[in-house]
Amino acid sequence: MTRLALLLVLALIAVPAAASDWGGIEPGVTTVDQVRDRYGRPSKETRPKIEGYDTLQWVYEGDQAPAGIARMTVDFGLLTAGGYKPNLVRLLTLEPKPFMFGKSTVIQGWGVPDAVADNKDGTSTYIWKDGLLAHFDKEGKDSTSLILSVPQPLVPSAPPAAPKK
């Protein structure tokens, strides 16, 4: 394990992190330019159209990925109350190398999850309402991916009441 990766793990253990922030990237706040300034040019860039909006996806792999991460994917383009913001981070997906983000490390870093789902394939997903989804392997010990987004409600809000007559 490299020294930087070890420091990263220790930092996560020592201080609880906001689920929607990792490695200087916070969905809904961080811009394309800020990601480029911090991580450089991506290994791969695509421009998918999602729900009619032009979006941007950057993938950092191999030597371009942060220490301890096999692949980091940053999706840009966020629909906000103020309109569509093509330069804001929508999602950050981390695919850690084995043993980088074990279940206890994730819980120590982000706290107790708000919900847990057991998947049909034997894996599990831990969900934090402030924007983190952590997928764990069949043994339930090692994370296979961490997906960070803007905070999400666990239960959809009720539709507004019909106007009174």
Predicted regions and their residues:
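Sec-dependent signal peptide recognition
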Residues: M1-L8
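Residues at structural and domain junctions
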Residues: A5, S20-D21, L91-L92
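Generic anion/oxyanion-binding catalytic loop in active/binding sites
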Residues: L8, G24, E95
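N-terminal signal peptide c-region/cleavage motif recognized by signal peptidases
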Residues: A14-P16
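Cleaved targeting-peptide boundary
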Residues: A18-V29
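A cross-family detector of function-defining hotspots
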Residues: T30-K165
